[in-house]
Amino acid sequence: MATSAATLEPQPRALQISRAIRIDSRSVCVAVIAALAILAVAIEGYHPFAEDGGLYAAGVERLLDPTLFPQWTGFVLAPMRISAFAPAIASLVRITHLTVPAVLLLVHIASIFATLLTAYCIAAQCWLSIRARLGAVALLACWMGLPVAGTSLQLIDPYVTARSFSTPCVLLALLAVLRFTSDVPEPKRRRWLFLCAASLTVASAMHPLMAGYGIAATCLSACLRSRRRAVQFAGTISCCAAALVLAGALQHVAPPESHAYVAAALTRTYWFLQEWRWYELVGLAAPLGILAACSGTWFTRLLEPCDRTRGHLSASAALATMATVLGVTAILVALLYARPEASTHLVARLQPLRAFQTVYMMMILMFGALLGEYLLQRHAGRWIAAMLILGAPVFVADRATFPSSRHIQISDTGESNPWIQSFDWARTHTPKDALFALDPDYIHAPGEDGHCFRAIAQRSVLPDYSKDGGEASIAPQLAEPWLAGLRAQRNLIPASLLLRNSPHASALRALGVSWVILRRASPTDLSCPYSNFAAKVCRIS
């Protein structure tokens, strides 16, 4: 009896050591992922008020100060119609008493960390090898700025948008599906099911469109992970058929579209596969081919899966198959219903090819796992060299996209971009109720780098061709005002003459415009209290 007691006595101590090792390994894992999140920001850059980031930021500023943007307000409110993003960020600003740029930066880093951490947890469900798991997440960190074929999306934007929340939430839902369909006790299964539903609910509140494609991905994954072959095949086919039928039904019941809306919709060439360039089409086909290959048995021989149950697809095979089926279905929907010549563009507006964000995520995880397991292995020098080499194209692409701006724009203080300087001057030297007009395509002016006037200057402005055109293409009620705004600014294009008493200046004043921003070379007799080598701010009334 004494011997038996002596034998049993060390077990609690061994259990404590085992738990301590697990906790320590988790701490190291979190630290590594935090370092990768910082690396991802350093590679991709950070531009909080550029492109879509400026659209969302303007909505946050409006909630914090309702006196901002008193004119043409619809273009400020449009991103907030069906998203809780702006109220959430505004609440964080109020709670933390930090500035909007500071909160946006913290949210950006946190969202990247959450994305990488969830991706690592997915990799941990797929492969036993630590090298494979770290390789998957390291490659994702290096390639976060990768463009998703011709969809006009990046895998992760270099600014904060509603996708900053929906992306990690969709990955968390996929993780929950993998755990729910594995061999876990019933109480834990219910917890994972609840986590899946909660993640998709948060994603839906932030970005309903991306959440919809996330729901499709989770449904496909659940079917493919079933132990019953009938569910695997019939469930997958049913999901694809349901998507095609739903798209056809939406196209059939869509209301007639105005001329202004059709004009706005046709400016979004990335909606239509027929408008894509050949290399963008390669960006659709190549990931599907890679993922189809990764769903085969050879892949499980190269990378040992965590689960080897007869009749049960491994997690990696299920995810690869899911992404392949999801991508093929999205292409079919786009080819059948998202066409420029279609009578309505409702399905095109839903942008089915955005589902390829998930496809690209899965492709990168699979490729990164192979890279870590067979090429990088345990050699620290190889890991460092690989991340430098693989991250370099994304870094160079960001510098090419934002050549006149800092790589990481934490604040506008000391900003060398001349357009941002002119927008800053407008914010500090004009009244809040001022209405501005610019070249409708100013966002593509040399050196402008895609920065949003509205978010930086915090002043009302007539709609532009690019970003406000995107809002008009999604919200049909904005199409007529958008077209009217473009017509009013048609003579503000580069090198156009703008005289104080000209009919065009009178037409702008009739709309309430009090200031214009022109390129430095544009001839005018207006008073321009601010100018630099790229732009000038002129009073028109």
Briefly describe each language-model feature range.
Residues 1-39:
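Start-transfer (signal-anchor) and selected internal transmembrane alpha helices
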Residues 443, 460-514:
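Luminal/periplasmic acceptor-recognition loop/helix of membrane-associated glycosyltransferases
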Residues 160-183, 192-194, 198-199:
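Specific aromatic-rich, kink-prone transmembrane helix
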Residues 26, 36-143, 147-169, 205-209:
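Active-site lumenal/periplasmic loops and adjacent helix-entry segments of GT-C-fold
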Residues 387-464:
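Extracytoplasmic
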Residues 40-53, 64-70, 76-82, 208-214, ...:
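Transmembrane catalytic cores of multi-pass membrane glycosyltransferases
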Residues 174-176, 191-208, 217-221, 238-244:
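Membrane-interface alpha helices of multi-pass inner-membrane proteins
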Residues 500-541:
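Aromatic/acidic, Gly/Pro-rich catalytic loop(s) in extracytoplasmic/lumenal soluble domains
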